């Protein structure tokens, strides 16, 4: 399972929404954050980051079973992803077709997300491809009233997944270019 919500009753728009949210958040967790901590602290930084991130994935829940000891891993994960989430968001905005609009929407909406970090890349992806993400959903049998990110966007469809993947592809090329540029500069 790649999403935390109940997927039994999702329609195609809900599935597209969940996939785009996962793509956006996992760009930060799986690409930007390991690179950030690797550049900052070397291989030990990557190992520490992945340990914290994995612990959060396994036990960082607010349910009865994990509440008493999972909160620490969740808060630590929030801390180590604070800068990488915003870097990811900024990079998505820079490679979008309308950078200023994406930045404006991101600064307006990102903090409305229930996560202190996930809202940043999710809002930037939503604004970049013109869809709305987050919003009400069902977690563990309870309907949430989460606000929409990029509320003026349309409901995502299957074709928006291709737009999201194209955006992610441009993101990877931009990161590769920046890493090569930094490597060249460090040798000068």
Give the role of each language-model region:
Residues 1-48, 52, 60-188:
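Hydrophobic alpha-helical transmembrane segments
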């Amino acid at each position: 399972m790649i999403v935390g919500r109940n997927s039994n009753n999702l329609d195609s728009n809900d599935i597209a929404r969940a996939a785009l949210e996962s793509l956006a958040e996992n760009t930060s967790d799986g690409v930007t954050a390991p690179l950030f901590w690797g550049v900052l602290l070397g291989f030990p930084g990557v190992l520490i980051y992945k340990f914290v991130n994995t612990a959060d994935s396994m036990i960082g829940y607010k349910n009865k079973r994990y509440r008493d000891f999972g909160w620490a891993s969740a808060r630590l994960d929030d801390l180590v992803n604070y800068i990488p989430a915003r870097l990811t968001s900024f990079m998505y905005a820079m490679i979008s077709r309308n950078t200023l609009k994406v930045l404006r929407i991101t600064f307006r909406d990102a903090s409305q997300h229930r996560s202190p970090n996930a809202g940043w890349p999710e809002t930037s992806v939503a604004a970049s491809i013109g869809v709305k993400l987050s919003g009400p959903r069902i977690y563990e049998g309870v309907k949430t009233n989460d606000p929409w990110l990029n509320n003026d966007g349309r409901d995502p469809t299957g074709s928006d997944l291709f737009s999201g993947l194209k955006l992610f592809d441009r993101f990877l090329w931009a990161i590769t270019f920046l890493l090569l540029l930094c490597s060249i500069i460090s040798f000068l």
